[in-house]
């Protein structure tokens, strides 16, 4: 019997038939072979495929599709020529309407893992985009040479091979154009290009960002040292070939690292920042400032957060993990007061600046953790009616969840970028809170990511 069990386990290189049951959290197909769970990128729910094992991990196996025996009716041809090599998108081969259904299903599965009772009826259909292409406002592409030509792209997963991306289908047309212009000029001026294997050369990365509403573009060159040969010519060419570029910056990163930005950033030409607007708010974006990557869907997400908060104008709001203050400022007009906190002091400085620029007098921002500030404010007699959390992928700190359960605001609005940590945290809050609904929002079409807004009300 022991022998038989051992034989049924998969081995690397083995081919086997499998039916795909669902999509995993990273967009891969999930199937079972002799009760062993197998993750297969590129396979879709309902498909029958022949797969080949690529890796055996503890408790699961990874495999690749060798042949699709029975294709999903929702399978489409990915329009991007480097889709399978690049790895930036995971779901271009799935019809967009079905992507939205599957993203909801990923959320349903995440909650099933943590909850005794089904949450399915509380999880709403995913809010998608009318045009799910060319939505990203920022591009960071590595620079290399191939057959003496300057290329820009991303490294193939787990390799040093740079995939040339001439036109990214999820990047805004202005960022694609700016990257193309810069790489053409670098080639024309014969500027030294960084070689990742030899770790020699000057220009490592081209970062381009567009302010979608104003049309302003910012270009940042990441280099290994400060000296930039033909600097004046480079600036003149960029400005001539693409007048929308209002800010040309340089950042120096000499470290052997995959982290893109180094510590030193300075202006080469134009302005330090570009102007972007989001609804009624305007923002100044410096080269390193955080800003949501899909402004169109950010408005949808923030409006959902506002709906969930159900404000009457009298509420005191806490914006935990506030960053540069975007969500809190989105709510401030409809609230009595917004208090935000973040552990990054620079973000708090930006939040204060943003609030001041918009003339808000009912906001207050502090550097530090919510679990430190909240008890202090409650002690001083200031108790929030609504707490909004928008944590990183890892979810809320346990201490913050404990603090929320002690402070007991009437509403908690949870904005999440990871269904798994969301479901775990919501389960912890259900000691005192009722889930009204979960609203998935598709911020990143053609990828496996899904954001959510959850409305929780005190029992």
Swiss-Prot record:
Catalytic residue positions: 417 (nucleophile)
Q: What is its EC number?
A: 2.1.1.-
UniProt key word Oxidoreductase = no
Q: Can you tell me which residues bind [4Fe-4S] cluster?
A: 80, 86, 89, 168
Q: Which keywords describe this protein according to UniProt?
A: 4Fe-4S, Iron, Iron-sulfur, Metal-binding, Methyltransferase, S-adenosyl-L-methionine, Transferase
Q: Does the keyword DNA repair apply?
A: no
| InterPro entries named in the record | MeTrfase_TrmA_AS, MeTrfase_TrmA_CS, NA-bd_OB-fold, SAM-dependent_MTases_sf, TRAM_dom, U5_MeTrfase_fam
A Pfam match is TRAM
TRAM domain ranges (all copies) = 9-67
Could you give a single Gene Ontology term from the biological process aspect?
rRNA base methylation
- UniProt GO molecular function: 4 iron, 4 sulfur cluster binding; metal ion binding; rRNA (uridine-C5-)-methyltransferase activity
Q: List the disulfide bonds.
A: none
Sequence positions that bind S-adenosyl-L-methionine: 292, 321, 342, 390
Say which family it is in: Belongs to the class I-like SAM-binding methyltransferase superfamily. RNA M5U methyltransferase family.
Q: What is this protein called?
A: Uncharacterized RNA methyltransferase BA_0426/GBAA_0426/BAS0414
- Organism per entry: Bacillus anthracis
